[in-house]
A protein has these predicted regions:
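Catalytic Walker B motif of ABC-type/P-loop ATPase nucleotide-binding domains
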Residues: 201-204
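Conserved ABC ATPase signature
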Residues: 176-180, 184
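A short, proline-enriched helix->beta-strand linker immediately N-terminal to the Walker B motif
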Residues: 195-199
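Helix-to-loop junction immediately C-terminal to a conserved catalytic motif
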Residues: 89
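Conserved ABC ATPase "signature" region
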Residues: 104-105, 153-171
Length: 296
């Protein structure tokens, strides 16, 4: 089948100043972002390129992440996913192009200004980056110690509140990471990422190395977190099944370029040859995965 142009999303970065979203309006009574802000463009990349020496790793990336939605960046090893992630969360700068977060171009910012930008992102890594030498209370409360002047009692209260929402009770507070199951570690790591109430939560390979049942449970947790906290989710993954279950917007990255993008149904049943090959090599039952989507 001939390869046509990439499937495109309904939104494209075609304005100089993307609409910003007030973080005060993130949550609604049912946990979703309110309709008035849900479709604002909270992260926008325009013509982003990144080179390391003579090697161009990202080639003209245009991307829009909408407030309250889940965008999944999927691709194989070497596609450029990790580099793209580091640029979005302000850990590195592009060689050229613009990156807007909440309507503001972060590329020209100083390191001091970028420190504030980074607090807009809650990071959940493939392996929950918990400190083995301290208990759950101190692990989860660490961002509050670093960035606020709250008392120990106030920090404990906020930690307990977050853990309860994520279905963990106070009995875990005194446990150390080595005592936690894999699922509990994921939840504890997520609680820590949410402590500063970031509008955007970024998941780096959340289902890597997990069996299908556990992967589905993690997907459910990601979507439940989006609904309960009213956050925008950005998921970096090689797992096309997870991507199709979660995404409002699925973006296939290949050789540093966006090869296809759109709703999962569009990628699954479109006429893009690169997407077809990636799905076929994954070996998934596309229709079964789409039938079990967390998002409708």
């Amino acid at each position: 089948m001939p390869s046509g142009p990439p499937v495109t999303s309904a939104s494209s970065p075609d304005s100089d100043a993307p609409a910003s979203t007030s973080s005060d309006a993130r949550a609604s009574t049912n946990g979703d972002a309110p309709a008035s802000t849900r479709h604002r463009d909270i992260v926008v990349l325009k013509g982003v390129r990144k080179s390391f020496g003579e090697t161009e790793v990202l080639r003209g990336i245009d991307l829009v992440c909408r407030h309250g939605e889940t965008t999944c960046i999927v691709g194989g090893s070497g596609a450029g996913k990790t580099t793209l992630l580091r640029l979005v969360v302000a850990l590195d700068k592009p060689t050229s192009g613009s990156i807007y977060v909440d309507g503001v171009d972060i590329v020209p910012m100083s390191e001091r200004q970028l420190t504030d930008v980074r607090q807009k992102f809650g990071m959940v890594y493939q392996y929950a980056a918990l400190l083995d030498s301290i208990n759950v209370l101190d692990n989860v409360g660490f961002p509050l110690v670093e960035h606020t002047k709250l008392s120990r009692a106030e920090i404990r209260q906020r930690v307990v509140e977050k853990l309860r929402i994520l279905e963990l009770d106070e009995s875990v507070l005194t446990k150390f990471p080595a005592e936690l199951s894999g699922g509990m570690r994921k939840r504890v790591g997520l609680a820590r990422a949410l402590m500063l109430d970031p509008p955007i939560v970024v998941y780096d390979e959340p289902t890597s190395g997990l069996d299908p049942v556990t992967s589905r449970a993690v997907d459910d947790l990601i979507d439940d977190t989006r609904r309960r906290f009213g956050v925008t989710s950005l998921v970096i993954t090689h797992d096309i099944a997870s991507c199709f279950r979660l995404a409002d917007q699925a973006v296939l990255l290949s050789k540093g370029q966006i090869a296809a993008r759109g709703r999962p149904q569009e990628l699954a049943h479109g006429d893009n040859e690169i997407a077809e090959d990636f799905i076929r090599m994954s070996g998934i039952d596309v229709d079964a995965v789409l039938a079990g989507r967390t998002r409708r």
